[in-house]
Swiss-Prot record:
Membrane topology: Multi-pass membrane protein
Effect ascribed to mutating residue 497 to A: Nearly abolishes channel activation by a synthetic agonist
Chain positions of site Interaction with phosphoinositides: 305
Taxonomic placement: Eukaryota, Metazoa, Chordata, Craniata, Vertebrata
Reported function: Nonselective cation channel probably playing a role in the regulation of membrane trafficking events. Acts as a Ca(2+)-permeable cation channel with inwardly rectifying activity. Mediates release of Ca(2+) from endosomes to the cytoplasm, contributes to endosomal acidification and is involved in the regulation of membrane trafficking and fusion in the endosomal pathway. Also permeable to Mg(2+), Na(+) and K(+). Does not seem to act as mechanosensory transduction channel in inner ear sensory hair cells.
Descriptive protein name: Mucolipin-3
Gene designation: MCOLN3
Species this chain originates from: Homo sapiens (Human)
Length: 553
């Protein structure tokens, strides 16, 4: 007799044969045989890799690929991280160097307090920054240079933004102002002579009307080459620094804040030559990345094949149940055929392949998108490590975490949705009421971060202590606000959240001792008592031949 497995497969695949099979009268023995075959097929599908090896001698290729992949992807990420670390360090050190170079009297950690308060100090700062720019080659200890535009070097743009008209008389409490903003700019060429005198003698041909002035911006470009990568057997990158020094007088409070912003872009060096073995090492790294791509491609194909087989078996089982039991399979039972771990591995493989391609482009200096590559490789590595948990879950002593998370997730999501409503209410209230009086409540983002820190018990005293006492009513409100938030979230909501997880954990432990509730699918499978090493599962591997040939006759 031919393998009955194919009967079910054939009937589930072709609607015409399904109708034929449904109408055909089969003997009770044949029906029992079909049920037995379906149970055995389902039981084999839900076996772990070791049991499948005992049942049919099938090698656990996906497990071997995942173990190999986790080692290779982790090594790749570490190597890329070390390279990216040099890029980040070079950016940060250059930004600090530029602040010391172009901001007069700048000291570290002065970004929030660096400001001037007199007109002469404003002109001093402007003249100092321009002079440092013109004397760059004489004052800078780095390999910085002006940007070349053809035969000329890029100029520094000095722009002031101010109200079109403004007559302000604070003594009389009167003003006349046109809020339209105008801009005036002029340029300073690096090769032009520049005479430095006193602020009264030389004001850069720039006259500032501080009553109307909003901002003054000095913008210029510099270039540099990151040579430290050579010591790590990597080709250097070329950097473009777009520097903007801003004198902010928008508040007109008598305090002009000064800041330096550094917009950095990495470019491929146009003409380079490095002696030694750097080129060879670069080729080795690209070969390694190519092998990672090949490994992930194999993993991707195997997992996609497994997902497709699961969906095919799902449809086959649904048709079988409808044909023999006149019942529809529940959605929860159907979802058991969709392996979420495989889907996660597929996503990680796709991210790794794309990230590895970008990494190879970066190493070849034809691409400089470090941030995108970091996100792709970092996310993929995280998912690869999480995917290994699936194989640990096949052991009863290791799958408690997985089962608890799966069981608790729906209730946790519902609970978090309710808690989020309360949390957002406190965020909006704290921002609008406490924002003018507390540094940690100046923006919605800062409010959310501050409240989340309070939930974790961090920085509580500082949050209370930094509240200004200029308004007694607001100060009293802040105490009620903070005490109620801490009491509500730490003692009630957080405790209920932990209790929700704990209750699920205890339930899972009890299930492990007394047995899990049987679904309709699991009950159907449990009637198959054949052990993996019984040899009966090997019969399912025969080529497919339909038993119901008479349907087509």
């Amino acid at each position: 007799m031919a393998d009955p497995e194919v009967v079910v497969s054939s009937c589930s695949s072709h609607e015409e044969e399904n109708r034929c099979n449904f109408n055909q009268q089969t003997s009770p023995s044949e029906e029992l045989l079909l049920e037995d075959q379906m149970r055995r097929k389902l039981k084999f599908f839900f076996m772990n890799p070791c049991e499948k090896f005992w049942a049919r001698g099938r090698k656990p290729w996906k497990l071997a690929i995942q173990i190999l992949k986790i080692a290779m992807v982790t090594i790749q990420l570490v190597l890329f991280g070390l390279s990216n670390q040099m890029v980040v360090a070079f950016k940060e050190e250059n930004t600090i160097a530029f602040k010391h170079l172009f901001l007069k009297g700048y000291m570290d950690r002065m970004d929030d307090t660096y400001a001037v308060y007199t007109q002469s100090d404003v002109y001093d700062q402007l003249i100092f920054a321009v002079n440092q720019y013109l004397q760059l080659y004489n004052v800078s200890v780095g390999n910085h240079a002006y940007e070349n535009k053809g035969t000329k070097q890029s100029a520094m743009a000095i722009c002031q933004h101010f109200y079109k008209r403004g007559n302000i008389y604070p003594g009389n409490d009167t003003f006349d102002i046109d809020p339209e903003i105008e801009t005036e700019c002029f340029f300073v060429e690096p090769d032009e002579p520049f005479h430095i005198g006193t602020p009264a003698e030389n004001k850069l041909n720039l006259t500032l009307d501080f009553h109307r002035l909003l901002t003054v911006e000095l913008q210029f470009k510099l270039k540099a080459i990151n040579l430290q990568t050579v010591r790590h057997q990597e080709l250097p990158d070329c950097y473009d620094f777009t520097l903007t020094i801003t004198f902010d007088n928008k508040a007109h409070s008598g305090r002009i804040k000064i800041s330096l912003d550094n917009d950095i872009s990495i470019r491929e060096c146009k003409d380079w030559h490095v002696s030694g073995s750097i080129q060879k090492n670069t080729h080795y790294m690209m070969i390694f990345d190519a092998f990672v791509i090949l490994t992930c491609l194999v993993s991707l194909i195997l997992c996609i094949r497994s997902v497709i087989r699961g969906l095919q078996l799902q449809q086959e089982f649904v048709n079988f149940f409808l044909l023999h039991y006149k019942k529809e399979v529940s959605v929860s039972d159907q979802m058991e055929f969709v392996n979420g771990w495989y889907i996660m591995i597929i996503i990680s493989d796709i991210l790794t392949i794309i990230g590895s391609i970008l990494k190879m482009e970066i190493q070849a200096k034809s691409l400089t998108s470090y941030d995108v590559c970091s996100i792709l490789l970092g996310t993929s590595t995280m998912l690869v490590w999480l995917g290994v948990i699936r194989y640990l879950g096949f052991f009863a002593k290791y799958n408690l975490l997985i089962l608890t998370l799966q069981a608790a997730l729906p209730n946790v999501i519902r609970f978090c949705c309710c808690a989020a409503m309360i949390y957002l209410g406190y965020c909006f209230c704290g921002w609008i009421v406490l924002g003018p009086y507390h540094d940690k409540f100046r923006s919605l983002n800062m409010v959310s971060e501050c409240l989340f820190s309070l939930i974790n018990g961090d920085d509580m005293f500082a949050t209370f202590a930094k509240m200004q006492q200029k308004s007694y009513l607001v100060w009293l409100f802040s105490r009620i606000y903070l005490y109620s938030f801490i009491s509500l979230f730490i003692y009630m909501i957080l405790s209920l959240f932990i209790a929700l997880i704990t209750d699920t954990y205890e339930t899972i432990k009890q299930y492990q001792q007394d047995g899990f509730p049987e679904t309709e699918l699991r009950t159907f499978i449990s009637e198959c008592k054949d052990l993996p090493n019984s040899g009966k599962y090997r019969l399912e591997d025969d080529p497919p031949v339909s038993l119901f040939c008479c349907c087509k006759k």
